[in-house]
């Protein structure tokens, strides 16, 4: 994914403009790509940014299709990757 923003539609049909934090590929749950994003202007109760993730497939016709993360183990892998990259960026 080359654009730095995406629009996510929630289960109620509301659109949320989100900043792409980073993307990565992983083979652990089949060859998948993942996107970590943060809804622009939305924060949690402590005022910290909200982060979320989805799998995605590149698609020439649509540009890309977002897919749900399917299992707790897959979420844990995404969370570990996010934490590792966040720690590396803090160290810089």
From Swiss-Prot:
* InterPro entries according to UniProt: UPF0473
> Can you tell me which residues the record assigns to a coiled coil?
none
List, alphabetically, the Pfam families matched: DUF1292
Q: Which domain of life is it from?
A: Bacteria
Per the record, the similarity remark reads:
Belongs to the UPF0473 family.
What is the designated name of this protein? UPF0473 protein BC_4380
